[in-house]
Amino acid sequence: MKKIFMIIAAMMWAVVPMLADEDRMIDREDLPKKAQVFLNEYFANAEVVYVKADREMGVVTSYDVVLMGDVKVEFSRGGEWTSVDCGLDRVPDGVLPQGVVKYVSSKFANAHVVEIERNKFGYDVKLSNDIDLDFGINGNFLRIDD
């Protein structure tokens, strides 16, 4: 009996960690509908390199999409974008809050947004000139982030 218990415990010890953080490659069509619409609207012609579902304890927590041209988009579990990284290229203006577009075009006319991250407090924006900016949830400028 003791031996059986030890075998079961050893099997559980081996299997549980595998379930805990099992990231899985999926097809673009398996993304939430909101994520698919976002990709079709802003990156319709970009070829998908891979789509990964990030999992914790067997539950999908987020999605990572990598497109040709060094574009990376992260989505929440529900399909809302959380970050868009276009490498050295411009993040499409339609992705950006209007306040971000206006501020960057007026204060940094020779730069463009190459990366944006959305969180519960607002937006973190990286410009092509390596300046990082913080914006509030309504797109209002807060500070230059150093």
Model-found features: residue ranges?
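Interaction-mediating elements
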Residues: 21-146
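Bacterial Sec-dependent N-terminal signal peptides
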Residues: 1-23, 39
